[in-house]
Design a protein with these regions (language model features):
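Short coil loop/turn residues that delineate tetratricopeptide repeat
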Residues: 58, 92, 126, 160, ...
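Terminal, low-structured helical/coil segments at or just beyond the last alpha-helical repeat
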Residues: 3, 26-28, 310, 315-361
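N-terminal leader/linker segments that initiate helical-solenoid repeat arrays
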Residues: 19-43, 47-48, 65, 343, ...
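Conserved alpha-helical positions within TPR/SEL1-like repeat arrays
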Residues: 30-38, 61-72, 95-106, 129-140, ...
Length: 361
């Protein structure tokens, strides 16, 4: 069985801009820099922050806001330097640790980012965003239990945050705690019905729990909002096939292929649906398409061989089976009885009748 695809929502990145709190020339430059920055002109703002720093080299707010401007421009090394200067001048500035952590994340220095978010939590233990961003690092490192704990802390501080429910649900799903994941996706959707990825991943959780009708409904919701989601068509097709809705599954696999023609999994599974429908010519074509892109896919040779049995092409079928056994000798023991059964059924029944067993059963 091919694995479903899961989408993950990246945790929100928060930045904080400090308000000016100094007087004189430095204050004027800082105020002008802040005005320009808020007007979407970070380059011009940096020049004003430079003036403020020149007037007062110990003005932490100027370094902080210049760091934010560099961050907005994607100049993350410079942002780190400015946030580090803020921390040197004011070691208890939680927001400087937080923002430097975000810059480190962009630089793919997650270990340093983790330390900074932890420092921010120590200084501001009641600020949910610190836990959210640390949780996202844990999640990215597959430390799912730690991610659960951090997202839980964030929800304790802000129980109305839909994205945090979503991200905790993803952590539950990664730990195969599907019931908890489904519950959290539901909470996320009750707070923000526009979270299309929550419908999608809840659909995955439902499908993995053999709740295929619920899964189909969630994939329906995804496709209402994003009719070009090839993954939603693909996974909805998988669920439809599980409840013997093969014609409908074929339609969804076809839409998935139309939207993502280079994906070999949709034609593979559409071929299996065609087999169940007794459309052996169509099935053989799909498995042939898979073999073109995946010439070492033993399963595709097995399935095409079964289709060819029902087409009356025994010689070609046997060649497919031998190729499959050459690629993966271990599968012969399991599939040989199915091959023998298919040959017997093909002789006893007219071509075009639905199959009995197939290798996935």
């Amino acid at each position: 069985m091919k694995l479903p695809r899961i989408d993950f929502l990246v945790c929100s990145i928060f930045l904080v801009i400090a308000a000016p709190a100094w007087s004189g020339q430095a204050e004027l430059a800082l105020e002008e820099g802040l005005r320009l920055h808020e007007a979407g002109k970070p380059k011009e703002a940096i020049r004003e922050y430079d003036k403020a720093i020149k007037a007062d080299p110990k003005l932490a707010e100027a370094y902080f806001n210049r760091g934010n401007a560099y961050y907005d421009l994607g100049q993350n090394e410079q942002a780190v330097r400015d946030y580090s200067e803020v921390i040197r001048l004011s070691a208890k500035d939680a927001e400087a640790y937080f923002n430097r952590g975000n810059a480190y994340r962009r630089l793919k220095k997650d270990d340093l980012a983790l330390k900074d978010f932890s420092a921010a939590i120590k200084l501001e233990p009641k600020d949910a965003k610190n836990y959210i961003n640390r949780g996202s690092i844990h999640f990215g490192a597959r430390r799912y239990e730690a991610a659960l704990k951090d997202f839980g802390e964030a929800l304790g501080l802000n129980p109305k945050d839909a994205e945090t429910f979503y991200n905790r649900a993803n952590s539950y799903l990664a730990l195969d705690k599907k019931e908890d994941a489904i519950k959290d996706y539901g909470e996320a959707l009750s707070l923000d019905p526009s979270l299309v990825d929550a419908y999608y991943n809840r659909g995955i959780a439902y499908a993995d729990s053999a709740q295929y009708e619920n899964a189909i409904r969630d994939f329906d919701e995804v496709l209402v909002r994003n009719p070009k989601s090839s993954n939603a068509f693909y996974n909805r097709a998988l669920s439809k096939a599980k409840i013997d809705r093969y014609e409908a599954a074929v339609e969804d696999y076809s839409d998935a292929m139309r939207l993502n023609p280079k994906d070999p999994e949709a034609p593979f599974n559409r071929g299996r649906a065609y087999l169940r429908l007794g459309k052996f010519d169509h099935a053989a074509r799909d498995f042939s398409e898979v073999i073109v892109t995946q010439p070492r896919n033993a399963e595709a040779f097995i399935y095409r061989g079964i289709a060819r049995i029902y087409q009356g092409k025994d010689k070609e079928a046997d060649a497919d089976f031998q190729k499959a056994f050459q690629l993966n000798p271990a599968i012969k023991k399991n599939v040989q009885p199915i091959i023998d059964e298919a040959k017997a059924k093909a002789k006893a029944s007219p071509t075009g009748k639905p199959l009995g067993r197939t290798p996935e059963q």
